[in-house]
Design a protein with these regions (language model features):
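Generic N-terminal amphipathic, Lys/Arg-enriched alpha-helix
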Residues: 40-53
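A generic structural signal for beta-strand entry/edge sites
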Residues: 33-35, 44, 140, 158
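Alpha/propeptide regions of enzymes that mature by internal proteolysis
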Residues: 2-25, 53-144, 148-149, 219-307, ...
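Acidic, low-complexity proline/glycine-rich segments
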Residues: 26-39
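A structural signal for short secondary-structure junctions
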Residues: 39-41, 209, 289-292
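Generic recognition of flexible, low-complexity loop/linker segments
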Residues: 34-35, 203, 284
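Glycine-rich anion/phosphate-binding loop at the beta-strand->alpha-helix junction
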Residues: 115-218, 223-224
Length: 329
């Protein structure tokens, strides 16, 4: 998810907007299947959990109380969250510190670039809420923050993570009749994976690269979020046909400032795509060797690559992908 500054994961707002943010009302709606939808400003979260009814009721209540204060908590530290990660963590809140810790491994390895804690904000928020479901009586739970997912699994539990590869074909009819996924894989309780995240130029975040998507499995959602950002940035090539603009011109409160971000990628020759995705794969393999990720799937136009066989069945069925994300099946 060239030198690789962070992607901005949520447009939280300028410090001068604290009063406005404080007056915004967090909202929650119960969904079919016992799921919950929490929304507050840019945060849009789906929570699913299975287990003892009373335990789940208490977990949902605690998660909601915590959720209501998260946005203002992050806004108060936003000026520091938008600075490049340095040797010593200057942050105070638990989510902000988690963001910094997830990004810290990349501070000296981005070929002259930089990374800010904002690269891990969505996964870190999901992880913060997951703590209320890591309790006796909860069989499994997942917090999906815009496609960045934190997972809890009790002993012998598992969850299937589905892959929807082409956002261009998505329409309202699929919501009524069921979404046809391009593939799925299972995460079991004996696996260390508890986080899934996706980054790419087509998503809601900024990216320096040309990947339609990079989906990462890691030990935590925060780690997956940061790594997906870094790997997606590494899927890159210099070509005049790629449209890039300063991040501050696309969104004036971006933590990336004048860094050029990708806004359009036309169809490119296969040899250029091969070179770009190979660069991203090399980055992903390096991160896996360092223990920062478990697996990664990289997609750019008609080319898919993966770090290992865990994700290969998905990629075999998705060779004409335009964009992808993560979703529970």
């Amino acid at each position: 998810m060239a030198s690789a500054p962070s992607c901005q994961r949520l447009a939280i707002g300028q410090p001068t907007h604290v009063g406005l943010i404080a007056n915004m009302q967090a909202q929650k709606v119960q969904l079919p299947g016992g799921r919950w939808h929490f929304q507050h400003g840019p945060m849009d979260i789906i929570i699913g959990a299975e287990g003892d009814t009373l335990v789940l009721k208490d977990a949902h209540a605690q998660a909601w109380e915590r959720f209501k204060g998260i946005l203002q908590e992050l806004v108060l530290e936003l000026p520091v969250l938008r600075r490049p990660v340095q040797d010593t963590c200057p942050l105070h809140g638990p989510i902000a510190q988690r963001m910094w810790l997830a990004c810290q491994p990349y501070q000296n390895s981005l070929q002259g670039g930089f990374i800010t804690p904002m690269a891990a904000v969505a996964g870190s928020v999901a992880q913060e809420l997951l703590q209320f479901y890591q309790a006796e009586g909860v069989h499994r739970a997942w917090i999906n923050n815009g496609g960045d997912i934190a997972i809890h699994l009790a002993t012998d539990a598992s969850v299937r993570v589905g892959w929807y590869s082409n956002l261009e074909r998505f329409n309202g009819e699929q919501l009524q009749n069921g979404i046809s996924l391009d593939g799925q894989w299972e995460i079991r309780s004996d696996s260390p994976v508890r986080g899934v995240a996706t980054s790419g130029w087509r998503g809601r975040s900024f990216s320096l690269g040309i990947a339609d998507s990079v989906t990462v499995l890691a030990n935590t959602a925060a780690q997956a979020d940061a790594a997906a950002t870094v790997i997606a940035n590494a899927v890159n090539i210099n070509d005049a046909r790629i449209v890039r603009r300063p991040a501050c011109e696309v969104k004036d409160d971006s933590d990336l400032g004048t860094t050029l971000v990708t806004v359009d990628v036309p169809p490119l020759p296969s040899e250029l795509i091969q070179r770009a995705v190979s660069r991203g794969l090399a980055c992903a393999l390096t991160l896996r060797a360092k223990g920062l990720i478990s697996s990664a799937a990289l997609v750019c136009q008609n080319l898919c690559m993966t770090t290992d066989a865990v994700l290969q069945p998905i990629l075999d069925n998705s060779l004409t992908v335009a964009a992808c994300g993560t979703e529970y099946a």
